[in-house]
Amino acid sequence: MRRAPAIAAFSVLVLALPAVAETWTAYTQPTDKGLQWSFDADYSYRDAASGRIVVMTAIGKVGATPRMGPSAPGAADGVGFVYALDCRAKNLIPMGSYSPKKPLEIAGGWRDSAPKKADGADDAALMRQVCDASAALPTK
């Protein structure tokens, strides 16, 4: 009987904690040095105010452990960027970047920033992969 309250309390605690899951999905081919860009599918969402898809990217080395960073959104143990993508117009707004020496800081007025054309093979690959799966993303 003493276990029932303990189990109930533990269950509430587990459900109250936020899930910190990471599903890094590669969107570029590895370079000759084994570097590859990926995006965190668990961090991606549709911004309710702008309609843009917000996505966190990171560069990692294929075969390294840990392969990708950051360990959580905003943690400064990886190198990457956060973008707001417009899938129809094929453009993006850089929202912020991070590195071990610079924690992630999202620009406060990013929605008012002028978008940049998604150019280059890496941008095209990111747009293709993220936009193809955008219907399943949550809106926040």
Which residues does each PLM region occupy?
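N-terminal signal peptide c-region/cleavage motif recognized by signal peptidases
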Residues: A16-P18
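Bacterial N-terminal signal peptides that target proteins for export
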Residues: M1-A8
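Repetitive helical segments and hydrophobic/amphipathic motifs
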Residues: S11-V12
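N-terminal secretory-pathway/extracellular module detecting exported/lumenal segments
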Residues: V20-F81, D86-K140
